[in-house]
């Protein structure tokens, strides 16, 4: 898989050998190792028919959409189902999730919390019986955001899902709002995190709790929308101009983002931006 495939999701590459299965069966195996993912090279012989992950709690007879995934898009699934083969890429493993760095981060800090349930390819597959899993994913993502804030209190984080991800296997983005990254190169990258295409985790949990499923904003038009600053909403003609502006923009975040815990930030940043 190469970055030229132009997908908003990223994954890690190298993989590892043994994991302590006994510890995994006993419960959470939480290692918050301060390591960087070295990237992941997808191996087609890494069984997509693996039984290592959890079985989905519901089947596809409920009308959820199915999608054909290319071989490169299977990498997150392979890691989630057999994380013991990818230890060098994984930051944390539990019975429910794995956490890893995005291979092509779109900000200073950008990690993925990946569900380990079979059959949950994307947000469209989520139903009410998966609510506890969503809460677990959110709690893990929040823990990592707070860890990063402890290291750098100037950062601000947002937790959420792409309405239609490019990589198979349900995953939560934990991404800092500086968007300071050489990997953020085009309109699709920006708009996948800064339009309604990006669904905040807190809203997804509320919708699934109330309606049994999340609202998807997966229209292709959202990824080609006009480039706008996520803080002051000013329009910009291209990514270089936008990124230059974002670096210096000190406007308050939109009020909608400052509500319901959609942003994770330190108290000092609340007083500045709210």
What are these regions (language model features)?
Residues 1-274:
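HIT superfamily nucleotide-processing domains
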